């Protein structure tokens, strides 16, 4: 994206129009190089983002966008324009980057130059960086699992982190064994490739004692293990590492923009495959925090690797708040579809702060319930817990309650991105913007 160096091509301006009816007042119309709004300018930012992305993707070659005209619409009605401006910049960077492809003739994306006042330049530059790391997460999400496995995932981020002032720690198989991370190691038993725990630390606020831990599920391919997925259910399981890509990309965005905050990403990385040594239903594994877990279903593996990573963030990294991101339960597609990401929180104050961050980022989230009753079906006669149950109902809430057993008293927010991580077979980099805003807010608390 170019700033104030316009192409010799048409310029898109934003304007408000009164020729649409009330039913169209929140819709975005694209007419002859102009982006027109109905009676009201957009406050439903997710819908606006979708409309703008759709418009930009239809454009060819080069395009100028007049952001000053956009800001003026909000100022004229005494509305805060910053979130709206962030959404526009996010939409532009989203469309400028080609998703992962191995086509011999990949689609050429539109190049965008923006016209903007100098007072908005810093915000635009900041959010262009965020958009670039959203795109990094998208690229990793779309990469086939034979090219992106735990060791390669680590290498990609080690390279991307060069010069950003972050500290990278990698726990390899021997380290995980020494640490007794039995849940992560149990999931890994069927794979020929070793597991990894990737830690990316960014500490840039010495005045604060707060550390935000972002924990990501990094199953680089999920076959279901011995409870193998059938039919079409194995398609798209390369996206089971989306949480790890998202949290790691977020920390790099914060570091690139030198945000005054303390944040650490923890990515639990492994494949979940069947094999002669794979864990089986009825096995009992010991978690990093010492709790024992009976395996009821090997396809409920995400909560296992997250449990060890969450305990590690609390015990070893001394996190004061933990947010985990995971493609955890397929039920989310029935509950919230691809519109909202489901959020579970052990703390109302933590939820309030997270919701504020999501609003600032323009990403739709919805809080779902946690209750001790949901945990009862996960009681085991032989271990402290079991990882799943045949009892119907509230499966997503039950998974969240399972994770809460490993937080060591630290406030936990669980983000289930099972239905929003990828849409129409393309990674979305969902929640990078929200997590970025949350970490940036923490610096001001």
From Swiss-Prot:
Entry EC number(s): 3.4.11.1, 3.4.11.10
Reaction catalysed by this enzyme: Release of an N-terminal amino acid, Xaa-|-Yaa-, in which Xaa is preferably Leu, but may be other amino acids including Pro although not Arg or Lys, and Yaa may be Pro. Amino acid amides and methyl esters are also readily hydrolyzed, but rates on arylamides are exceedingly low; Release of an N-terminal amino acid, preferentially leucine, but not glutamic or aspartic acids
Record's keyword annotation contains Protease: yes
Binding site for Mn(2+) 2: 217, 222, 240, 301
Enzyme class: hydrolase
Protein residues bound to Mn(2+) 1: 222, 299, 301
Subcellular location: Cytoplasm
UniProt remark on cofactor binding: Binds 2 manganese ions per subunit.
Keyword rRNA-binding: no
Cofactor(s) this protein cannot do without: Mn(2+)
One Gene Ontology term from the biological process aspect of the record: proteolysis
Source organism superkingdom: Bacteria
GO cellular component terms given for this protein: cytoplasm
GO molecular function: manganese ion binding; metalloaminopeptidase activity
Active site, renumbered: 229, 303
InterPro entries, per the entry: Leucine_aapep/pepB, Peptidase_M17_C, Peptidase_M17_leu_NH2_pept
PANTHER family on file: CYTOSOL AMINOPEPTIDASE, LEUCINE AMINOPEPTIDASE-RELATED
Protein family (similarity comment): Belongs to the peptidase M17 family.
HAMAP family to which the protein is assigned, alphabetical: Cytosol_peptidase_M17 (MF_00181)
General function of this protein: Presumably involved in the processing and regular turnover of intracellular proteins. Catalyzes the removal of unsubstituted N-terminal amino acids from various peptides.
The protein, known as: Probable cytosol aminopeptidase
Source organism: Mycoplasma pneumoniae (strain ATCC 29342 / M129 / Subtype 1) (Mycoplasmoides pneumoniae)
């Amino acid at each position: 994206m170019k700033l104030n160096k316009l192409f010799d091509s048409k310029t898109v301006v934003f304007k408000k129009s009164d020729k649409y009816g009330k039913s169209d007042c929140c819709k975005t119309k694209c007419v002859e190089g102009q982006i027109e709004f109905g009676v009201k300018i957009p406050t439903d930012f997710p819908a606006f983002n979708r409309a703008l992305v759709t418009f930009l993707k239809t454009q060819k070659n080069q395009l100028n966008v007049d952001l000053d005209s956009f800001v003026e619409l909000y100022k004229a009605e005494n509305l805060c324009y910053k979130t709206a401006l962030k959404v526009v910049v996010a939409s532009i960077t989203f469309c400028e980057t080609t998703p992962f492809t191995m086509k011999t003739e990949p689609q050429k994306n539109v190049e965008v130059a923006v016209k903007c006042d100098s007072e908005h330049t810093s915000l635009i530059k900041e959010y262009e960086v965020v958009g670039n790391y959203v795109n990094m997460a998208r690229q990793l999400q779309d990469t086939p699992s034979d090219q992106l496995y735990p060791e390669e995932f680590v290498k990609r981020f080690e390279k991307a982190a060069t010069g950003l002032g972050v500290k990278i720690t990698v726990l390899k198989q021997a380290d995980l064994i020494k640490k007794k991370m039995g849940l992560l190691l149990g999931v890994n038993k069927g794979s020929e490739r070793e597991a990894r725990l990737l830690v990316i630390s960014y500490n840039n606020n010495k005045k604060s004692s707060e550390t935000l831990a972002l924990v990501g599920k990094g199953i680089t391919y999920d076959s279901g293990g011995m409870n193998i997925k059938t039919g079409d259910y194995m398609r798209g399981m390369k996206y089971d590492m989306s949480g790890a890509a998202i949290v790691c990309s977020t920390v790099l965005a914060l570091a690139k923009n030198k945000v005054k905050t303390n944040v650490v990403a923890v990515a639990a990385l492994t494949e979940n495959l069947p094999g002669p040594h794979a864990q089986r239903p009825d096995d009992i594994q010991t978690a990093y925090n010492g709790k024992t877990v009976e395996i009821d279903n090997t396809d409920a593996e995400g909560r296992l690797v997250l449990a060890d990573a969450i305990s590690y963030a609390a015990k070893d990294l001394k996190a004061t708040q933990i947010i985990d991101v995971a493609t955890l339960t397929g039920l989310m597609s029935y509950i919230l579809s691809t519109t909202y990401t489901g959020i579970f929180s052990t703390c109302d104050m933590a939820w309030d702060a997270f919701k504020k961050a999501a609003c600032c980022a323009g990403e739709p989230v919805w809080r779902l319930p946690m209750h001790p009753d949901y945990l009862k079906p996960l009681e085991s006669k032989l271990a402290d817990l079991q990882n799943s149950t045949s009892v119907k109902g509230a499966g997503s809430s039950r998974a969240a309650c399972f994770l809460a057993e490993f937080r060591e008293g630290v406030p936990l927010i669980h983000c289930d991105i099972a239905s929003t991580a990828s849409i129409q077979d393309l990674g979305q980099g969902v929640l990078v913007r929200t997590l970025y805003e949350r970490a940036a807010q923490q610096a001001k608390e």
